[in-house]
Amino acid sequence: MCDTIAAIATPSGTGGIGIIRISGPKSKERLTELFHSVSPKFTDFKPWMLHRGYLVAPTNEFLDDILAVYMPAPYTFTGEDVVELHCHGGHFLLLTILETVLCKNIRLAKPGEFSQRAFLNGRMDLTQAEAVAELIAASSRNEVLLASNRLKGLLGQKIIDIRRRIEELRVWICLAVDFPEEESGIFPLEKFINGLLEIHEIIQKLIHAAERSRCWKEGVTVALAGAVNAGKSSLLNALLGKERAIVTEHPGTTRDFLEECIIVNSLSIRLIDTAGLRVTSDPIEEQGIQKGREKIDEADVILFIIDGTVGVTEESKLLINNFGVERTILVWNKVDLKVPPSNWTELYTSSQVSGICVSAKTGSGIEELLVLLYNFVLSQHNAQEPTFDTIVPNMRQVEVFSLVLEEIRSLYEDIRSGIPYDLCAVMLENISSMLNSIIGFDTPEEVLNRIFASFCIGK
């Protein structure tokens, strides 16, 4: 890491300000060559202060009126000397300035290379580095919260605590191996097993937290299903608050599925409007119905729309029970035209099922439907809204934790069956090494390269 790197750190496009980040031992030296201060009293860059001046090309050509800041190592993001050039945010202007910087024997940074240097220089562990990328990619408040908690180091601290517990168990094993005849070498088997089970429980809770939080990170898919003319497309428009789907009185208007996303209390919901379910001789409509059924089968939640003016039909009852009531919400539409009986959900299925009455035309009940849908998803995933101390590992980390649990279970069975203590010590070292790979202590280089390559350039 002896070379100096640079990249545009702000999103591509046009904006008021664009930032070029430079990191490495030659950062300040190259800044001095390119920057001309507007202040006649300027002599040198004061660290951590913005300096206004002109950026000039090697040909002495004026490029931009900028603010520059020099940040000396080691208390920077990368742990190296860092310079930031705050320029006007024109896309081609930034490219021109970057080309000028790169002419000064500075290399273009690879994707994620600034974060990789921060990790390699000990400014953050691997869980924090991954959190940076997830924070940038977050599309809801709860995703931001989950990523920022890892960026604070909460998961890394939890892993360090688990490793400390494992080291205590390993010390007991080593004493029993090295001093079998002495009092200090008496192996506390039950205490060891209890400690092992406590570690297992801690990791199991982390995995369960990830499973429960899947809806925040991945969102959910909700299919709008029902008979023709039940008002599925009208309901889609009402939920979106805009006219997205074509609505007519003619049956079979929707011949293909439509997809749109909404955010409800930081939960990303992908709504899919499907073709009305019926027997048809139209091959195009039949193809749309088949596609719709596939989307319904794949959906996390089904909003089964009932035409209130038609009421209960045997076909609807059959469809609802085939779809599975555990992922279905019954929606009695057109309540402005006909109010259902108080026990209307029981007319469709003997099982407990959620139901609500709405009018897609007037908007009655739409807000209540969104609340019901939100709570339904949370109940379905056994999820809770994250707080400022919620620790949720990502997919890679969960995979490693799952392997750790398998190793702990094997150790539990083996020590119960009486295997030699020195083999138990080896298994504990293996568990500790797995945990190290999560925070980056023993992570293979190819894994690190793959992780940081997924970052954007400039981060």
UniProtKB/Swiss-Prot annotation:
EC number(s) on record?
3.6.-.-
Signal in keyword set: no
Q: Which cofactor does it need?
A: K(+)
Q: Cellular location of this protein?
A: Cytoplasm
A GO biological-process term: tRNA wobble uridine modification
Cellular component terms per the entry's GO annotation: cytosol
Report residues binding (6S)-5-formyl-5,6,7,8-tetrahydrofolate. R21, E84, R123, K459
Q: Which residues form the TrmE-type G domain?
A: 219-378
Kindly state the subunit structure of this protein: Homodimer. Heterotetramer of two MnmE and two MnmG subunits.
Under what name is this protein listed? Answer: tRNA modification GTPase MnmE
Gene that specifies this protein: mnmE
